[in-house]
């Protein structure tokens, strides 16, 4: 169970991180331990589930009072230190926390158009990839539409921002994954999952050039309602390294879907 913010009655989790370092220690009710899973929520909280009680996450960050809306979460190591990165969609910023859950940095892209804010986030090959989506009036949810989106790349400390993709093939982009060398037509491509229309677009990971979109066996562009996470297996416990797994909130996020995509050419 993921706890609600102070005074709340429920939580809406978004980003999830698995952490094997044990450095993100959470404590409550006499229990303490390194979080195995960490969760960000649209309620403005970050929680962790320690090994001693995996079924009950413990609140570590609560920024609900300031209106924070976390849409994504990632983790990375700089030297011997571990950090969390949360995309605060409401406040148009990426928040960087150390292993003690102290806020150590905030950053964003000042050059995106007004009302665009960090949405999805993932560490790929030692770089921080961040998607940007358009905010709705309340700055709580995205405003979907063709070409509504950007993808940036940052160093792990938030510096050296570089725009990789602008608009083309994007529609409230959230999921990110780098394809392996044996994923058919889109081998070695950066894949971006669009929450807005359920399409998965492929780009050159260096130049950002648009390469196309994933299609089904009949040549039709794949559409996955409510598409969220996309990730490849690790070749061992989480499945084949060239199988793309996905999660989705189908039927306007009232149900969940977990599936897989395999390249046939």
Task: Kindly give the residue locations of the regions a language model identified.
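Sequence/structural signature of beta-propeller domains
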Residues: 1-265
């Amino acid at each position: 169970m993921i706890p609600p913010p102070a005074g709340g009655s429920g939580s809406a989790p978004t980003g999830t991180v698995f952490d094997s370092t044990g450095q993100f220690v959470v404590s409550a009710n006499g229990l303490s331990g390194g979080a195995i899973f960490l969760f960000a929520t649209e309620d403005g909280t970050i929680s962790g589930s320690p090994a001693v009680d995996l079924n009950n996450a413990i609140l570590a960050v609560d920024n609900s009072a300031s209106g924070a809306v976390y849409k994504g979460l990632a983790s990375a190591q700089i030297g011997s230190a571990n950090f969390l990165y949360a995309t605060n969609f409401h406040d148009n910023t990426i928040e960087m926390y150390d292993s003690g859950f102290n806020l150590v940095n905030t950053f964003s892209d000042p050059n995106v158009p007004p009302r665009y804010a960090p949405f999805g986030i993932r560490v790929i090959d030692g770089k921080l990839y961040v998607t940007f989506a358009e905010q709705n009036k309340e700055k709580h949810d995205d405003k979907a539409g063709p070409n509504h989106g950007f993808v940036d790349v940052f160093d792990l400390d938030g510096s050296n921002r570089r725009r990789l993709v602008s608009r083309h093939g994007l529609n409230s982009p959230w999921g990110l994954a780098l394809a392996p060398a044996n994923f058919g037509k889109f081998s070695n491509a950066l894949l971006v999952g669009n929450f807005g229309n359920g399409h998965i677009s492929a780009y050159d990971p260096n130049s950002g050039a648009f390469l196309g979109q994933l299609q089904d066996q009949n040549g039709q562009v794949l559409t996955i309602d409510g598409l969220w996470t996309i990730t490849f297996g690790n070749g061992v416990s989480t499945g084949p390294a060239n199988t793309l797994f996905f999660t989705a909130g189908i039927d306007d996020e009232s149900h969940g879907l977990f599936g897989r995509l395999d390249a046939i050419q």
